[in-house]
Amino acid sequence: MKRWYHKMVDPIHHLHLQMRLEGREVVDACFIREVEAVPGEEMPLMLIAGLANGNVVAYYDEAVSGDLQEALAASLAGLEFPAIDPLLDVLKTYDVQSEVGHYKTYVFPSIPVKDRGVDCFSKLDKRVRAFGFDGPTEQVYAMEREGKVVSACVSTRENEKCGEAWVFTAPEYRHQGFAQRVVNAWAGSLMNAGKVPFYSHKVENVASAHLAGRLGLLPVFEEIVIIRA
């Protein structure tokens, strides 16, 4: 258990795992390239991450010109994460229009206890399809009330090493702890299979942040993704 826990809280390891989940990999220490087209994901011009151990790391699209990369790296030296205005100023100087996304990612401190009130459904199950929540992976972890699915969690993306949660609860069944239970069931299934379950959200998503707190998750990194507009 100690060995597993130590691996769980290695922030740079988990940052690279999530990058690969999004179809990217690190090359030459500070550059990234797309290795797989993932729906809904755009190749970042630059990615800056504040790690749980206090370090800040940055990666650049390998297609970025050398002079722009050097200017961004020089600006990064005096940056106080998550304030990135100096980087955006550099991009404006180079006439690069950009958009920014800011996200927080967590891992689970231990394998959740099995919850007999949560069932595992096929994404093809008619109750799951009626809920509008089939997702990209086969297994959906859900709770039923009166014969219908009211809360569910599935991997929004998953590979042989990790997965990332996508959770939704019907509005009339919220604030009853259902989301917490289905996320825990989903996470437990991945961890028992030797995979890392990630929970991520945009920093402005207060409801998702509160759910992370109720789940007792460990913040592992916070990232700012800059893409071309």
Q: Which sequence ranges carry the predicted segments?
A:
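Conserved glycine-rich acetyl-CoA-binding loop
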Residues: 162, 167-181, 203-204
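Conserved acetyl-CoA-binding loop-helix of GNAT-fold acetyltransferases
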Residues: 175-191, 210-214
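Conserved beta-strand-loop-alpha-helix junction that forms the acyl-donor binding cleft
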Residues: 199-210, 218, 225-227
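Active-site beta-strand termini and strand-to-loop segments that position acidic
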Residues: 51, 108, 144-146
